[in-house]
């Protein structure tokens, strides 16, 4: 091989490596947050935009509530469902009283929250002692979720790898109907309860990860969420914006430079 040809080949290889490096640096600018964001206005792995979009296109009437005070016409309705994927958000006693009024009017309320114990204490009609533990958690990388169409594994993933997570479960067993479970280390734990209130019903769910983009795109999770919603079905869906509440946030995870591609499942 003559010297000029070697130089040409070497220059070509260098150019390819340079292009690859530039491509990597370009891709690195497209960063994704792997913390539990629970926002519905973006495409982060743990945002809620896919779920919100599917709920909006479900064929039901759909209305977004930006908080509970700006427009209170929802309080005069009946036969409807309010959905609040709270994540780590919390509410105060005044907001809780508005939600209870909504339910007792003849509506359903579904809240999925990591702050399960606090939420139950604010919303339940059950008589509860001050020192009674309503919810607790177990640490694990993976749990087995029970759905009407079978079981599936669920994990909190960072850079697409499972990480240890606090899985919240509902410990109180009086007054509530246990409607959903997950399994960990051979034991079943309740993660969905139902409680009749007035002419409506309260549903509290303790595994909000299933509503996030990263998991909701999977068929098993999509079907599970549909079945949860079916328990609280109404004529109109009121979607309570998670951004209207304080978000203390879950464990903070660094951003990944890897491109995260969300595969939106076909609507069924």
Give, region by region, the residue ranges found by the protein language model:
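Membrane-embedded segments
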Residues: 64-146
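Juxtamembrane/start-of-transmembrane alpha-helix segments at the extracytoplasmic/lumenal side
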Residues: 252-268
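A glycine-centered loop/beta-turn motif at secondary-structure junctions
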Residues: 171-253, 257
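Second-shell loop/turn segments in exported
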Residues: 37-42, 86-88, 214-215
